[in-house]
């Protein structure tokens, strides 16, 4: 059956709802966005993305164009709200809908061994949750809890967490529900606010970044998680090999 035309709110309005519900001020959202850009710019300078990037031939593109390492809180503060006249969600503290592509190869242990492929990581657990579509941004909260429980580990066991940054307000709402999570390990190389959110590719992208960062740090456990605009969340726990 067809879905009703007006059955939920636009994604940006959903971010405004979360900002209001969790008391996330505009300045806090802008600071989160600035951190995303600064971390992504630092990661590019340190060539931490080199192992996971495949350049596009032709007019060669080998770097995300939306990273603005030179932005500032003043620059972000000058941007007008997009979804409400007196709102807090702007183009600067939201993810850009970049073009992009990502691919991962999944195989069972026997198949990988037979092909002589050395796995980068093992999927330990995954979970999907459902929430009120108006509050889609907190979908990762329950999904993450279930995935951790299924993997038999806790927040303190994680070495890296990749939380997709659809909006700063959305990501901060999730973090507010995870007080036991060390924020220093969340998106250490920046997130979608800086790197972009190519719909259909972001899940594979954050999973790829997660696995490479786990191996770079010598950490064992990691999680990739994201909200889904129609009222869901998804989380995957991986173990680096």
Feature map (PLM): residue ranges:
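Active-site pocket-lining segment
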Residues: 13-16, 124-194
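N-terminal extracellular/periplasmic Venus flytrap/periplasmic-binding protein-like
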Residues: 28-114, 180-185
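Condensing-enzyme catalytic core mediating Claisen C-C bond formation in acyl metabolism
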Residues: 74-138, 142-150, 208-209, 214-221, ...
């Amino acid at each position: 059956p067809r879905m009703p035309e007006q059955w939920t709110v636009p994604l940006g309005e959903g971010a405004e709802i979360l900002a209001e519900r969790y008391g996330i001020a505009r300045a806090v959202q802008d600071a989160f966005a600035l951190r995303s850009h600064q971390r992504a710019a630092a990661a590019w300078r340190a060539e931490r993305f080199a192992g996971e990037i495949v350049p596009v031939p032709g007019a060669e593109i080998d770097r995300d164009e939306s990273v603005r390492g030179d932005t500032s809180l003043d620059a972000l503060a000058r941007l007008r709200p997009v979804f409400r006249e007196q709102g807090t969600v702007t183009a600067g503290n939201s993810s850009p809908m970049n073009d992009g592509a990502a691919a991962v190869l999944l195989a069972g242990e026997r198949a990988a061994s037979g092909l002589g492929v050395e796995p980068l990581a093992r999927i330990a657990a995954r979970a999907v949750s459902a929430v009120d579509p108006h509050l889609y941004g907190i979908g990762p909260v329950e999904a993450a809890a279930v995935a951790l429980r299924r993997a038999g580990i806790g927040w303190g066991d994680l070495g890296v967490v990749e939380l997709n940054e659809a909006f700063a307000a959305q990501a901060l709402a999730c973090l507010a529900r995870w007080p036991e999570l060390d924020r220093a390990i969340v998106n250490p190389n920046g997130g979608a606010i800086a790197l972009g959110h190519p719909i259909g590719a972001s899940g594979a992208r954050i999973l790829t970044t997660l696995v490479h960062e786990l191996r770079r740090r010598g950490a064992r456990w990691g999680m990739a998680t994201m909200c889904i605009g129609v009222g869901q969340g998804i989380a995957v726990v991986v173990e680096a090999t």
